[in-house]
């Protein structure tokens, strides 16, 4: 496994998508176009809203992003599920960053609130993930609350994001 850093650039995040950052069979981000993170600006095992660790990350929005022409024609909006998936991606990344082993999977979320939209004129998305707990058992389970800001305004909030790492072999 790579040395734990406090931030990651785009190339380092892509290496996680290729399965190189945390080692084969361990936490892995999706590759573009499903990758919803361009930079991890800060990651820590302590601090955050619950003092159990946090991640702060960013995604640069482009009017040319793949989802705008199809969602919806004449009214382009980034699907809210992509922002939620970005929160799950970061929750799983945190578990791999802690050194936990296994393949990641989004499991659930308690509540999601959408208060705004990402449109082609949006420039920057910022993520905040604050960890409540990490449980280690048959699978490693991370639970966190998250938010997404579009150009500085909080537009999504999610509570009890849950991501697990399982050591089961891939199909």
Curated annotation (Swiss-Prot):
Biological process according to GO: unsaturated fatty acid biosynthetic process
Listed EC numbers: 4.2.1.59, 5.3.3.14
Molecular function, one GO term: trans-2-decenoyl-acyl-carrier-protein isomerase activity
Organism annotation: Agrobacterium fabrum (strain C58 / ATCC 33970) (Agrobacterium tumefaciens (strain C58))
A Gene Ontology term for the protein's cellular component: cytoplasm
Name of the featured protein: 3-hydroxydecanoyl-[acyl-carrier-protein] dehydratase
Family: Belongs to the thioester dehydratase family. FabA subfamily.
UniProt subunit comment: Homodimer.
Active site: 71
Keyword NAD: no
Pathway named in the protein's UniProt entry: Lipid metabolism; fatty acid biosynthesis
Family annotation (Gene3D superfamilies): Hotdog Thioesterase
SUPFAM superfamilies: Thioesterase/thiol ester dehydrase-isomerase
Alphabetically ordered keywords of this record: Cytoplasm, Fatty acid biosynthesis, Fatty acid metabolism, Isomerase, Lipid biosynthesis, Lipid metabolism, Lyase
Record-linked PANTHER family: 3-HYDROXYACYL-[ACYL-CARRIER-PROTEIN] DEHYDRATASE, 3-HYDROXYDECANOYL-[ACYL-CARRIER-PROTEIN] DEHYDRATASE
InterPro entries: FabA (IPR010083), FabA_FabZ (IPR013114), HotDog_dom_sf (IPR029069)
A family per Pfam: FabA
Subcellular location(s) per record: Cytoplasm
Catalytic activity: a (3R)-hydroxyacyl-[ACP] = a (2E)-enoyl-[ACP] + H2O; (3R)-hydroxydecanoyl-[ACP] = (2E)-decenoyl-[ACP] + H2O; (2E)-decenoyl-[ACP] = (3Z)-decenoyl-[ACP]
Function description: Necessary for the introduction of cis unsaturation into fatty acids. Catalyzes the dehydration of (3R)-3-hydroxydecanoyl-ACP to E-(2)-decenoyl-ACP and then its isomerization to Z-(3)-decenoyl-ACP. Can catalyze the dehydratase reaction for beta-hydroxyacyl-ACPs with saturated chain lengths up to 16:0, being most active on intermediate chain length.
